[in-house]
Each structure stands twice: as C-alpha cells, then as structure tokens.
C-alpha cells in the first residue's frame, strides 16, 4: 500500500499543471556581441581582414511556460536582441561602412531542467529575422553609396543558467548564437551567412 501511495504521489508531481506555478517571465540582459573576422576577397595583401568590434548589446525577453514538472519546464520565449554600435575595421576605408546596428527577433522553445531548484540550466532553439542598419558614412568619412537597411532570416540556438535570487527574481547568464545573413558592407567575403555570438547576464522576473 505504501508503495502504491508513493507511486501515485510521484506520478502526480510529474503532471502538476503549470498553471499552479508562475507561468510568465520577463527578463533584461546586458552583454556583448562577438563576430569572427572575415577575409576580404581581393583585399590588400598587407591586411585583407574585415574585423568587428564587440558591440554593447541588450536583450528583452518574454517567456510563457507551456508545460512542466519538477524535472523540466518547456516554455515559449521571444528574445529581442539589439546591438546599437557594431564597429567595423578594415584596410579599405573608402568602401566599408564605419559600423551598423543590428536587431534580432527569434521566437523559440526553451527547455529548463529542474525549474523549481535554486539552479536551473536551459537550452533554447528558434528562428525569426535579423535586421541590420548600416551606417550612412564610410570609415573614411564620406557618404556610404551602399544599402543602409538589410533584413534576413535568423536561426537562434542558446544555452544558459538561471539562479534563484530573491522572491520572484532570478539571475541569468546566457550564450546565444544568431546565425543570419550578412549586412551590406560593400565588400566580398565569400560568405553568405555569419554567426553573431551574444554573451550576457541579467535579471529575470517570474510572475
């Protein structure tokens, strides 16, 4: 009898409706975006690399838990990530824009492990769009003759960890890779896509 009671209790814990818990999240994350150097085809022999700065980046993210148990929680999230100052460095100042802004919006599914414990790791995967707003000025200071608005598709994969802090708040650290098309930088790198790596940390409000 005790065995049956214990089994029933464990089964009930596994199917507790998510409505019994705080189902919504709103998070604010601050970090940096990292982009690998790209070779410029036909660029100067002494320096043919297109280099990117590590732009200060922030994320606002809304998530809603759809189902879960003591072992896991599955949520739908909408990370919106903005990099307002991605500097560019190249030995072709009369061709390359001085920088650009980027905006990523990628609805995703996120799986948290052990969501009710003090520490909860998670993974996320989704897709949406990326928009690049290229500078109207070139590195040399003259007017950019190229396009100054580029929208592409985007895939997002991420990992992170949530640590309960106080009451309805958690501290979050995360890494996300946004795989997108390219901004219009007026040079040929031989690539059609790039990885935009976002690393950041911030607070999550559970309500």
What are these regions (language model features)?
Residues 163-207:
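Predominantly the C-terminal beta-signal and adjacent terminal strand-loop region
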